[in-house]
Amino acid sequence: MSISEIVLIGIALSMDAFAVCIASSMVYTNMTGLRKLSMPILFGLFQGIMPILGFFLGSLFASFIEKWSGLISLLILGIIGINMIREGLAKDEETEPKKLTLWILLVQAVATSIDAFAVGVSFAANSANIWQSAPIIAVTTFVLSLIALFVGTKAGEKLGDKAEILGGIILIIIGIKSLF
């Protein structure tokens, strides 16, 4: 498999992380420094680790992942999205800015990287070089998530209070898309 093919796979895999990063950075407007950078780092890290896990553990979990990955992603992202919409609609003037916790970041990173596990399974079936592929996928996701962070921050500044509702809707749409 060529490097350009791996980069294209990395771009495809990172689209969910890209959208979640935009949605989160619109909502969690008080992030600074390391907290902001932790989002692309974790998303890239998980997108790089999951193909490795899929490569080596795929034969054990392949049928489960193929059958349930879309539903798992929908449930995780749907719950987070519904909660964001609910909080956005109930927001009053004295509400403190939402804080992006490590738990939320980890849940988002796992939810957006489940499909990378399945890609790892296919890499094993095709005898692809996982040690070349995983870092390329991780870096691609990191770079695109970093771009999404800036896009989402600017959009959040412009949208103000509506950003949380829009962010929740985006997460729900990504969850629904994962079913297909």
Identify what each model region corresponds to.
Residues 2-18, 67-77, 129-143:
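Structural signature of hydrophobic alpha-helical transmembrane segments
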Residues 21-34, 82-94, 145-162:
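C-terminal ends of transmembrane helices
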Residues 13-24, 87, 112-119:
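Short helical (or helix-break) motifs at transmembrane helix termini and adjacent helical loops
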